[in-house]
Amino acid sequence: MKTFVTSWADEVDADYVDGLPPSNEYIKGDFKYVTEYKFNDDGKKVKVVRTFKIEKQIVPKAVARRRNWVKFGDSRSDKPGPNSQTTMASEEIFMQFIGSKDFDQTHETQLDPGKNIAKCRICNGEHWSVNCPYKGTSMDSKTVMETKANAAAAAAISDPSKTGKYVPPFMKDGGGISGSKNWGRGRDRDDSSAVRISNLSESMTETDLEELVKKIGPHTKMYLAREKNSGLCKGFAYVHFKFRQDAAAAIEVLNGHGYDHLILCVEWSKPQP
């Protein structure tokens, strides 16, 4: 931009309207030069020369018709194209029209590209657990727990002292002896498939206890010890499994297992007097 200041004598001779010379333009080759005059922020008259490169391009019919619209208002007598007095030339903004499917894909990637919402439960990687490359290997904690449970169940089944068959109460040890110390006290309680779970938190409930053991095997009953006055958990519970091998699997899997910021202690339930 080059500053051009005229004298008052030149303005009188030229008889300029509002004190500014008229703008002019000329074309030389593939370039168009437009010369304009205006006042800057300091109130001084300046000369502005704009250079445009002429390019020929094929545009849609709607764009061509829009360029031939008749101007109105203060721009009624303007030449085709933008007028610097009413139009401000700026950088071009290219628009791209996409379909609904492309928009959904673009929107999902722009939600938070730096953060992955998927987290693997096996290796804590940024992918879904079903796609984990370590699934089924030694790093898979679920596989390790299942292996321990199956091994404990097999060991319990192979115990020669436990046949796994139903034994009536009168055929058990001392069941047929009359006058014994247990006579008249009802049937003896079978604790062979019961386990004791200790080091539980005070907020432990029956629902939490069932969620903890239901994946190991079916159980017949549960008992969660609670304080008489406050109703809070005393820290231990008893679970009677339907099968002894499931009880052995529970001891192998849950003993030393972290639950609610505590380390569980699971062992066989001792016979009650």
Swiss-Prot record:
Coiled coil: which residue ranges?
none
Q: Which SUPFAM superfamilies match?
A: RNA-binding domain, RBD (SSF54928)
What subcellular locations does the record give? Cytoplasm
Keywords from the UniProt entry = Cytoplasm, Initiation factor, Protein biosynthesis, RNA-binding
Q: Name one GO cellular component term.
A: eukaryotic 48S preinitiation complex
**GO annotation, biological process:** formation of cytoplasmic translation initiation complex; translational initiation
| SMART domains documented for this protein | RRM (SM00360)
- Please give the subunit comment from the record: Component of the eukaryotic translation initiation factor 3 (eIF-3) complex. The eIF-3 complex interacts with pix.
Domain RRM residues, every copy: 193-271
Concerning Pfam families, the annotation shows:
eIF3g, RRM_1
Select a single GO molecular function from the record's annotations and give it.
translation initiation factor activity
InterPro entries, per database record: eIF3_g, eIF3g_N, eIF3G_RRM, Nucleotide-bd_a/b_plait_sf, RBD_domain_sf, RRM_dom
| This protein's record includes keyword Protein biosynthesis | yes
According to its UniProt entry, the function of this protein is described as: RNA-binding component of the eukaryotic translation initiation factor 3 (eIF-3) complex, which is involved in protein synthesis of a specialized repertoire of mRNAs and, together with other initiation factors, stimulates binding of mRNA and methionyl-tRNAi to the 40S ribosome. The eIF-3 complex specifically targets and initiates translation of a subset of mRNAs involved in cell proliferation. This subunit can bind 18S rRNA.
Q: Which family does it belong to?
A: Belongs to the eIF-3 subunit G family.
Subcellular location, principal: cytoplasm
Respond yes or no to whether keyword Protein biosynthesis is given for this record. yes
Name by which UniProt lists this protein: Eukaryotic translation initiation factor 3 subunit G-2
